[in-house]
């Protein structure tokens, strides 16, 4: 439970501040800007206290003080950007469970938009993915209860539950005339973040589904196992980050580091000019400089974009697919005490090694490959992106709305993947990067221009 704020206490604080301001003009002269900001802050808190007291005393039904404070906090944060949220103690515990990669639920990454849940991406091989939930779907009801009025954390909590229990989702999909209902059986979501196989004995395919605590260790094991399986035939690796919604910043950095010998991976810049952190690669490319292709699409967000941007800027990998989601902000988790939960607050923007912010723009691929999307999926898998989220942080320059997020369920229909295998087999080993337009043959699709 949040600690309740006493309006009387707020009033006392305001009174003291006003007295100090009125009786010490010299100090005001010296520190007018600081005091001005503080006084304005106190005035706004006093306004909050007045409204709080009126609502508590005069609302038609009895209003619980704790809920009023919760509503106020939720409103304050939702007005900042789509990714800043308050988590109560239970929500904070759930977040810690998420980063370990195991929880009971249905397996989707969601964000809140205009009071409804928007699917960023379903996690591979989870109940949601198997039930046909797609990126860009809008969830309006959970077990017949409207999502409108719930916080993001409350909605996520409702989707979790005992293994083998069921939940009904009412879904709105662009292109469908009517909403439809899906019943999903919850399962233990043990998110193995890395999957891999050897393609035709000479290309290592590695899919990273999210960035959780075990991701880098799982990646290195995949590289080692594929190298052993192939003998001396391995030509290179395809790293598939499509529909990967992101995750932990430190894992994005260490995954990038696994493929780089040196150089900056990402810089994180806060509000003040001095609040800049730079993260650089350590010596030792875990693949021994094997050629790389990175696959991205409109569902590749956040940590995925850090990896794709770093490898692209250093010309370590050729990036293939469609423009990424465009989430270029960093959220810090700020604990508020054991009983009070935590804030997940946007505290910085991140920049690729070349100094580009991808906020509301995304990473543009070196080779753009558009999938053949079945008619029933066309409307629901196109034009998603950070720039389409209400209240998003604005881009430094022109914003881009997003791109395709469809991945064909059958590998034989996956044009981006086939292009990646073709590129690897024709890539210059010395650079690990295919010069733009050089596919060793006719390009199977269009070549993207410079970012």
Language-model features, listed with the residues they occupy:
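PDZ/PDZ-like peptide-tail recognition elements
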Residues: 71, 83-121
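Short flexible coil/turn linkers enriched for glycine and charged/polar residues
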Residues: 100-104, 112-116, 133-134, 161-165, ...
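N-terminal activation segment of mature serine protease catalytic domains
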Residues: 35-84
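PDZ-domain C-terminal substructure recognizer with occasional recognition of PDZ-binding tails
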Residues: 115-118, 140, 154-195, 346-347
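PDZ domains, with a preference for the canonical peptide-binding region formed by the helix
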Residues: 138-170, 251, 327-334
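PDZ/PDZ-like domain micro-motif
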Residues: 43, 124-137, 192-195
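Conserved PDZ fold ligand-binding element
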Residues: 52, 128-151, 240
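C-terminal "post-core" interaction segments
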Residues: 4-8, 12-15, 19-23, 30, ...
């Amino acid at each position: 439970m949040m600690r309740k704020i006493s309006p009387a206490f707020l009033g006392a604080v305001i009174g003291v501040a006003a007295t100090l301001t009125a009786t010490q003009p010299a100090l005001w002269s010296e520190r007018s800007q600081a005091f001005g900001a503080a006084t304005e802050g106190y005035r706004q808190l006093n306004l909050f206290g007045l409204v709080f007291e009126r609502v508590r005393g005069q609302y038609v039904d009895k209003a619980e003080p704790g809920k009023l404070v919760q509503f106020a906090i939720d409103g304050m944060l939702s007005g900042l950007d789509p990714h800043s949220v308050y988590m109560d103690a239970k929500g904070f515990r759930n977040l810690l469970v998420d980063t370990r990669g195991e929880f009971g639920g249905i397996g989707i990454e969601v964000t809140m938009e205009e009071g409804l849940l928007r699917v960023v991406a379903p996690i591979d091989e989870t109940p949601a993915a198997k039930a046909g939930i797609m990126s860009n779907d809008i969830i309006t009801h959970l077990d017949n209860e409207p999502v409108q009025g719930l916080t993001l954390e409350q909605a996520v909590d409702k989707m979790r539950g005992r293994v083998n229990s069921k939940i009904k989702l009412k879904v709105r999909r662009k292109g469908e005339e009517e909403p439809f209902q899906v019943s999903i059986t919850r399962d233990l979501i043990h998110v193995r973040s890395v999957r891999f196989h050897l393609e035709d004995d000479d290309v290592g395919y590695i899919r990273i589904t999210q960035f959780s605590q075990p991701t880098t260790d799982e990646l290195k094991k995949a590289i080692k196992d594929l190298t052993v399986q192939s003998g001396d035939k391995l030509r290179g690796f395809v790293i598939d980050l499509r529909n990967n919604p992101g995750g932990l910043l430190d894992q994005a950095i260490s995954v990038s580091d696994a493929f780089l010998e040196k150089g900056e991976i990402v810089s994180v810049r806060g509000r003040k000019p001095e609040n800049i952190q730079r993260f650089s690669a350590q010596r030792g490319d875990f693949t021994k400089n094997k050629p790389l292709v990175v696959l991205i699409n409109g569902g590749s967000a956040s940590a995925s974009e850090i990896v794709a941007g770093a490898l692209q800027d250093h010309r370590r990998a050729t990036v293939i697919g469609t423009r990424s989601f465009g989430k270029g902000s960093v959220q810090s988790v700020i604990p508020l005490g054991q009983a009070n939960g935590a804030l997940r607050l946007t505290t910085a923007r991140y920049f690729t090694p070349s100094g580009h912010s991808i906020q509301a723009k995304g990473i543009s691929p070196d080779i753009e490959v558009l999938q053949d999307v079945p008619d029933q999926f066309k409307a629901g898998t196109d034009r998603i992106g950070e720039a389409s989220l209400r209240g998003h942080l604005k881009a430094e320059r022109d914003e881009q709305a997003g791109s395709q997020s469809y991945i064909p369920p059958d590998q034989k229909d996956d044009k981006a993947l086939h292009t990646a295998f073709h590129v690897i087999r024709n890539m210059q080993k010395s650079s690990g990067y295919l010069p733009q337009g050089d596919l060793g043959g006719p390009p199977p699709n269009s070549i993207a221009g410079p970012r």
